[in-house]
Amino acid sequence: MNVLVGTVTSTPCVAVANETAADNMFQLTPSGSATECVANPNVFRVCFSDPNQGTAAAQYIGEHKLATKVAIIYDSSDVYSSGITQNFTAEAANQGIEIVSSEAFTADNNKDFSVQLQKAKDGGAELVFLPIYYTEASLILAQAD
């Protein structure tokens, strides 16, 4: 039996899933959380899926009354970020959380977040939700005032 243990993130997991299916190879991802990761019957994941993470984050914010006005900054070119954002937005409505801005960036435009941050500020955001990786998150935090 051939086995692929990996990939670590969603985008490469989705990219190789059809190849492992064609090769009749068992694929296990420890942290590929996009729903598309397990679209083929040969692929399994160990972690929570993006829908679970987005829903749980909105529930936590709502149940603990952390904010009623939330801005979202996400990477629309990444299945992980987009998947979490979609489910967070849906559950936020159920929790009575107003999304005051939902601003995207892409992998080729991920250095200057002044526009997204200004829209969050103008919308009166009490919390900014960042379903993204640490590189961009650190830039956003450094640019926020």
Residue ranges and their predicted role:
Residues 23, 39-44:
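Ligand-binding "clamshell"
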Residues 11-14, 52, 79, 135-136:
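Short alpha-helical
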Residues 43-106, 126-127:
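An alpha-beta-alpha
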Residues 1-8, 28-30, 69-74, 124-134, ...:
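Periplasmic-binding protein-like
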Residues 35-38, 93:
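Short, conserved catalytic or adaptor-binding loops enriched in Gly and charged residues
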Residues 1-36, 105-107, 111-113, 138:
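Beta-alpha junction/loop-to-helix N-cap segments that form part of ligand/metal-binding clefts
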Residues 20-23, 84-145:
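Extracellular/periplasmic bilobed ligand-binding domains
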